[in-house]
């Protein structure tokens, strides 16, 4: 794992997430000057050979401004109506600003199932890759006109992380009104320290995340840390930076303060990237210390090391594996459904046939269907890097 931050222009594929408050003003609507300025930055990156994708918030915020909806929380149907109006205006604005640099914009609206269901995930990835291949800039947003409260990303930070892992990006940049991660909310604690480099997203780092989002947006530092966990586990670095200034990407290149989250040093297969990035695991499997150690050694998860099964999942569903400290250590595809899994926990693999009445798999989750997650993975690989240094 390398903690060295490279210039933006040296990255091959970059995902830029833009918060609603940067694009939309409650009174005046779209911030056209700001949009034109960041399109200058994007054009410069593209000219240097980088593939650039934009995850743009702002559809609901822009739509509610156009419709003159009152301040305060919106009902689901009001949000969907605002999104329907705002998506048209937002796409047009991006297209016009990028066209000044002879760049074509392509709009992609995603729902949670587009990244959680394998076939739709592959289709979405193919579409984005084709847009990049022909030189277009994908402008991506959650399809808020059809997303429901129960089935949605809920914020564009995590959506951006999923897009980054889905398309093999090596850098994710989260632009908002926050310039990075502090040890505590700086407006509440004058002694809060700014963190320029985050090597691992540990429980201590997670505890630092907090604070409510603005009325125009749904994200906060909590969702940015969640995004960092998704991105860095897939080998993608992440930057949290303020976008309040014009040309914010150029500002980052020129040394403006921002927080850098180092990627894990081990690229994983596309299939395992998809498994690791699942936002809604169908269930949980809690394991003992011996099983947890075996997982870190690259072994499959056997029934003997399982202590508890939670949830109602089917065979092939993505599930979270919880270690002895109560934190997620891995994710994988279930080799058994929840009912069968509960019957065989704590038993040896050679006892499965007697219990279930048929010859089943020896592993609860096979190592080919399993990927380690969390800071412990990075610590492990960092030690390996030290050995080989």
UniProtKB/Swiss-Prot annotation:
Matches recorded under SMART domains: PUA
One CC-aspect GO term: cytosol
Catalytic activity: L-glutamate + ATP = L-glutamyl 5-phosphate + ADP
Domain PUA: 282-359
Catalytic activity, EC: 2.7.2.11
Entry keywords, A to Z: Amino-acid biosynthesis, ATP-binding, Cytoplasm, Kinase, Nucleotide-binding, Proline biosynthesis, Transferase
Enzyme class: transferase
Protein name, per record: Glutamate 5-kinase
Organism in which the protein naturally occurs: Agrobacterium fabrum (strain C58 / ATCC 33970)
Designated gene of the protein: proB
């Amino acid at each position: 794992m390398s903690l060295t931050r490279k210039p933006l222009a040296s990255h091959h594929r970059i995902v830029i997430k833009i918060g609603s408050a940067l694009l939309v003003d409650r009174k005046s609507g779209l911030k056209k000057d700001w949009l034109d300025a960041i399109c200058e930055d994007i054009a410069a990156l593209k000219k240097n050979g980088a593939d650039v994708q934009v995850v743009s918030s702002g559809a609901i915020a822009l739509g509610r401004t156009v419709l003159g909806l009152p301040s305060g929380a919106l009902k689901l149907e009001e949000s969907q109506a605002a999104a329907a109006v705002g998506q048209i205006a937002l796409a047009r604005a991006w297209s016009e600003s990028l066209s000044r640099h002879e760049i074509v914009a392509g709009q992609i609206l995603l729902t949670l199932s587009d990244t959680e269901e394998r076939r739709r995930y592959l289709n979405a990835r193919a579409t984005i890759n084709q847009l990049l291949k022909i030189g277009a800039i994908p402008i991506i947003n959650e399809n808020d006109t059809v997303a429901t409260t129960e089935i949605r990303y809920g914020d564009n930070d995590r959506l951006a992380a999923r897009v980054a892992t889905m398309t093999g990006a090596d850098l994710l940049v989260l632009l908002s009104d926050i310039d990075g991660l502090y040890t505590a909310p700086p407006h509440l604690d004058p002694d809060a320290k700014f963190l320029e480099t985050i090597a691992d997203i540990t429980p201590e780092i997670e505890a630092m995340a907090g604070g409510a989002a603005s009325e125009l947006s749904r994200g906060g530092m909590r969702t940015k840390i969640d995004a960092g966990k998704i991105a860095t586990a897939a080998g993608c670095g992440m930057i949290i930076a303020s976008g309040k200034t014009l040309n914010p990407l150029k500002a980052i290149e020129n040394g403006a303060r921002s927080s850098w989250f180092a990627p894990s040093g081990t690229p994983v297969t596309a299939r395992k990237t998809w498994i690791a990035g699942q936002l809604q695991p169908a269930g949980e499997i809690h394991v003992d210390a011996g099983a947890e150690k075996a997982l870190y050694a690259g072994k499959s998860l056997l029934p003997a090391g399982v202590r508890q099964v939670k949830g109602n999942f089917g065979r092939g569903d993505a599930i979270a594996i919880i270690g002895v400290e109560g934190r997620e250590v891995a994710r994988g595809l279930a080799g058994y459904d929840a009912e069968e899994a509960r019957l065989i926990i704590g038993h040896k693999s050679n006892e499965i046939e007697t219990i279930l009445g048929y010859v089943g798999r020896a592993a609860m989750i096979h190592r080919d269907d399993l990927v380690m997650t969390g800071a412990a993975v990075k610590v492990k690989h960092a030690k390996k890097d030290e050995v080989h240094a």
